[in-house]
Design a protein with these regions (language model features):
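Conserved HGGG/HGGXW glycine-rich cap/lid loop of the alpha/beta-hydrolase fold
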Residues: 16, 41-92
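Catalytic histidine-centered segment of alpha/beta-hydrolase-like enzymes
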Residues: 264-277
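An N-terminal hydrophobic leader/cap segment in hydrolases
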Residues: 1-35
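Conserved serine/cysteine hydrolase catalytic core
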Residues: 210-251, 260
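Gly/Ala-rich beta-loop-alpha elbow adjacent to hydrolase catalytic centers
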Residues: 127-135
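Flexible "cap/lid" loop of the alpha/beta hydrolase fold
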Residues: 136-174
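Conserved alpha/beta-hydrolase catalytic His-Asp/Glu region
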Residues: 158-163, 173-230
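Active-site loop/oxyanion-hole signature of alpha/beta-hydrolase fold enzymes
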Residues: 83-124
Length: 285
């Protein structure tokens, strides 16, 4: 069951917000921070690159907050304005408010409100993890120049039995460095080594945050709106939570393309940041 807050106890959000600030201190480029006030509470927005640059919107999806997406932000053309957003209701720097009732309709309105608050018209959007289905739920699909959904959750059923299941339970039960590292390695592709900042962040998520397993899947009617639009799904061939075959099936429903990343798991912003940045502007295959 999906809880009303991503945090285990009152006050835990302050620990996570502090962790986001700590990750942000390691960025080498100047970062602009602002808060958009929306129907789901305060939404934390990071921006890098020239203020006059053409914008790209990236929605953080739970595995990492916006402040943890430095490698991805640095992989885009430096002339672009990269806007990274923490979703309310997911671990990150935004409000802990989760929608009641129709989750995707509420998040779709929220995303439109954020674009309006930032005075953004039509823009390419990259949705990561759980934010993939949120990006696909935007109220007006005409606001999206190209939609890229990476390591997407909320589109197809999650795998029930997978290599990250037991490490994930151990991490939830005792989120020390050893269990956290084992869990991250199980999520990622072979040979992945998490850095210290990612380890510390994931330890805190295990200790202070609830599971996102109860997040619902996007409704068929919302998904079908994307027929004829530029949509691409990106998934690692070693992603333990999402299998490629059902993603291909749902992509075929709307004429979307699927890019399978060899040797990668589900931590694509860390495993393949350059590829993700390139896919935002690659022609649909």
């Amino acid at each position: 069951m999906l809880t009303k807050s991503p945090y285990r106890c009152p006050g835990d959000d302050s620990v996570i917000h502090h962790a986001c600030a700590g990750m942000l201190s390691h960025w080498s480029r100047p970062v602009d921070e602002q808060v958009a006030r929306t129907s789901l509470g305060e939404t934390h927005v990071l921006s890098v690159g020239p203020a006059t640059g053409r914008p790209i919107v990236v929605l953080a999806g739970g595995d990492l907050p916006a402040a943890g997406l430095r490698d991805l932000a640095d992989s885009f053309d430096p002339s672009r304005r990269v806007i990274l957003i923490d979703l309310p209701g997911l671990p990150g720097a935004s409000a802990c408010t989760r929608p009641e009732g129709n989750v995707h309709a509420a998040y779709g309105r929220w995303l439109t409100e954020v674009l309006d608050a930032l005075e953004i018209g039509v823009v390419p959007i990259l949705g990561l993890g759980w934010a993939a289905s949120v990006a696909a739920a935007i109220t007006d699909v005409e606001r999206v120049e190209k939609l890229v959904l990476a390591a997407p959750l909320g589109l197809v059923p999650r795998a029930r039995w997978h290599r990250a299941l037991i490490p994930g339970l151990q991490w939830r039960n005792e989120p020390n460095f050893e269990n956290t590292e084992r869990y991250l390695r199980a999520l990622a592709g072979s040979g992945f080594e998490p850095d210290g900042a990612t380890l510390r962040w994931s330890c805190r998520v295990g200790a202070y945050c609830t599971s996102l397993a109860g997040m619902p899947r996007i409704g068929r009617s919302l998904w079908q709106r994307w027929k004829g639009h530029a949509v691409e799904l990106v998934v690692g061939d070693q992603d333990p939570l999402v299998h490629v075959a059902p993603l291909r099936k749902i992509a075929d429903e709307i004429g979307a393309s699927v890019e399978v990343v060899e040797g990668a798991g589900r931590l694509l912003p860390l495993e393949a940041p350059t590829l993700l940045a390139e896919e935002m502007f690659a022609p649909i295959r």
